[in-house]
Amino acid sequence: MKTKNIMIVISILFNVVLFTYIYWRESHLKEMYSNLSFGLQGDLVQLESTIEYQNNNKWNDENVVLEKIEDVREGIHQLMVTGINVGMITKSQENDLWTLYRYFANFPTYTGFPNTKLENNDINKLIRLRDDLRSAGWGTNLGYSSDWASFSMKIEDLTN
């Protein structure tokens, strides 16, 4: 009887530790995923301010804008892959990210070489992108949130 009681106590303690670990791990994954979303929105704000800076300085270093667009694409990909791998992304969120990814596929790609010259048409598209980012809520001195509902609304505003 005494051995049975000891086994029950050990089993209860083990289960408490296991549930605590699972809860902590789930909380940690949610926080990490939220930080990725917040980081992507930070990249969008930096892209807006980089376009503004280049526009004010006669596009003297347009590769910086292309690098920022690449950062946004990588952020979208990282958020999507991480969300799928840890099972934290809903189908609606995945669709939002695909919409955003397709939207940014329409802009020039960073080649890795610092001598890329943008055509006037590309510059005009980027200026329009800056305006669209600001109107969606991603811009310098504009606040943004890490909750997905706000993020999703901004994606819809940007892509429509």
Segments and roles (model prediction):
Residues 1-15, 19:
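N-terminal Sec-pathway targeting helices
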Residues 10-12, 23, 77-83:
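Hydrophobic alpha-helical transmembrane segments and immediately flanking/interface helices
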Residues 15-39:
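Transmembrane signal-anchor/signal-peptide helices with a preference for the extracytoplasmic
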Residues 33, 90, 116-119:
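Ser/Thr-centered flexible coil motifs
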Residues 33-51:
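Short extracytoplasmic/periplasmic juxtamembrane "stem" segments immediately C-terminal to an N-terminal membrane anchor
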Residues 50-108, 122-154:
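Alpha-helical segments in soluble extracytoplasmic regions
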Residues 113-125:
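Cytosolic/nucleoplasmic, non-transmembrane interface domains of endomembrane
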Residues 155-160:
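Short acidic DE-rich linear segments
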